């Protein structure tokens, strides 16, 4: 379990670092805040299956997160991953096979830890 925690922390830190390298500070803050919004909505409404998947071609997502270098990496650090290089959807890790009653405790714990980590980075911007 500790290895998962360390990996998650490193992934968030690496994604924020990538954002900082390739974008101006205002963009970094915007992307982090938007990503936090997605993760917090998921954490609060984990039974809402619509939140388990993000359409990266959606204009709102693309304009606020997807078009910036490091944005998709940040979403991956928060638990969303692409099924393939050509997929237009990011799917929450661990959501496949989840029941309508919600995500597993381990998936929720991972998302919440990532939220805390990203919040710390965002507060430091």
Locations of regions flagged by a protein language model:
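Ubiquitin-system adaptor modules
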Residues: 1-125
């Amino acid at each position: 379990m500790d290895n998962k925690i360390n990996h998650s922390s490193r992934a968030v830190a690496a994604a924020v670092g990538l954002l900082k390298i390739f974008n101006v500070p205002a963009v970094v803050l915007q992307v982090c805040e938007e990503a936090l919004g997605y993760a917090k909505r998921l954490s609060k409404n984990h039974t809402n299956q619509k939140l388990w998947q993000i359409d990266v071609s959606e204009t709102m997502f693309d304009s606020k997160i997807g078009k910036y270098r490091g944005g998709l990496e940040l979403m991956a650090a928060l638990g969303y991953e692409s099924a393939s290089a050509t997929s237009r959807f990011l799917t929450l890790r661990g959501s496949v096979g989840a029941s309508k009653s919600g995500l597993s405790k381990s998936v929720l714990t991972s998302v919440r830890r990532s939220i805390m980590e990203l919040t710390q980075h965002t507060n430091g911007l």
